[in-house]
Regions:
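N-terminal cap/lid segment of alpha/beta-hydrolase-fold proteins
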Residues: 11-35, 94
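Mobile cap/lid helix-loop segments that gate and shape the active-site cleft of serine hydrolases
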Residues: 16, 155-192
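Short beta-strand element of the alpha/beta-hydrolase
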Residues: 34-42
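Catalytic nucleophile-loop/oxyanion-hole region of alpha/beta-hydrolase
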Residues: 49-51, 69-119, 249-253
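C-terminal catalytic histidine-bearing segment of alpha/beta-hydrolase fold enzymes
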Residues: 79-86, 217-269
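Primarily recognizes the serine-hydrolase "nucleophile elbow" in alpha/beta-hydrolase
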Residues: 102-166, 184
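Acidic catalytic loop of the alpha/beta-hydrolase fold
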Residues: 159, 207-211
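Short beta-strand/loop motif that positions the catalytic acidic residue
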Residues: 196, 202-204, 208
């Protein structure tokens, strides 16, 4: 596999991995044996929020001594949103984003020495549809390829009524498969929490106007039932899409970053 490296900004590097428009932007940490986090921005599996849920997150993690990798995974893209061409043509759809995350995990592990990170300390963090993507890693990937920890922030979780985010379902499944009940069920994450699931740090807000907050409620219940070590921060206010942007959300929801860092240290990876 050929990897193309270009300079993105002074403190980051963008690498093209896998197929299509898949890119990984690295924000290297300064110390040795660092923790690494692969960040998956949201966007309903149609596009990416590369600012609040991508670059802002990468810079924030880097400042904390964490090596961040922001993943531009394959999405359906805007033409698929405004038309229904995927009724005829395949386009980008499941399992493309999942395959891209799997490839990113493999890449970071293979280049752990280069980035001065520990292969045993590579976690994943995702926002909205990206939260669904990172949580699906332990349900769809072989156990030996699991991340060390998972951070879904205001995630899409279920693909079935009544709490489904329909735009994300359409983006992931494609127009020709949105009615496939078996596929919907298999990608409803609350139904398939595996034994030995890595620790999870879950965040959402009750006033989320985009992804119904019950998505996180059912995930929390499933994690509890499977005795998965996890933290669930459920804020009253904050809405959706705040990521690591200090100008978005509410004062209370923006504390999630501080709580995450405390939790991460408690894992003693």
């Amino acid at each position: 596999m050929v990897t193309v490296l270009t300079i993105f900004i002074a403190s980051a590097q963008t690498l093209r991995i896998g197929k299509g428009r898949v890119e990984l932007t690295a924000y290297p940490a300064s110390g040795p044996d660092a923790t690494a986090v692969i960040v998956c921005p949201g966007g309903s599996y149609f596009w990416h929020d590369k600012v609040s849920e991508g670059d802002s997150v990468g810079h924030w993690l880097q400042r904390q001594g964490i090596c961040a990798f922001v993943l531009r995974y394959r999405t359906a893209y805007v033409p698929a949103f405004i038309t229904h061409f995927r009724l005829i043509f395949r386009g980008n759809r499941y399992p493309d984003p999942q395959n891209d995350l799997r490839e990113a995990l493999r890449y970071v592990r293979a280049h752990a020495t280069e980035y001065r990170v520990s292969p045993e300390k590579i976690g994943v963090m995702g926002f909205s549809a990206g939260g669904h993507l990172v949580m699906s890693s332990v349900e769809l990937f072989p156990r030996e390829e699991w991340p060390a920890f998972i951070v879904p922030v205001y995630p899409v979780v279920t693909m079935v009524e009544p709490w489904v985010h329909k735009r994300s379902r359409r983006g992931l499944l494609g127009d020709s498969r949105t009615g496939n009940r078996q596929l919907r069920d298999s990608l409803s994450l609350e139904k398939h929490i595996p034994d030995g699931c890595p620790p999870v740090f879950l965040v959402n807000c009750e006033d989320d106007p985009i992804v119904d907050f019950h998505n996180s409620v059912v995930l929390d219940s499933a994690l509890t039932a499977r005795k998965v070590p996890h933290v669930y921060l459920r804020y009253a206010t904050g809405g959706h899409g705040f990521g690591a942007n200090c100008r978005k959300g509410s004062a209370e929801c923006r504390t999630w970053r501080r709580h995450f860092l405390t939790w991460l240290r408690s894992l003693n990876l």
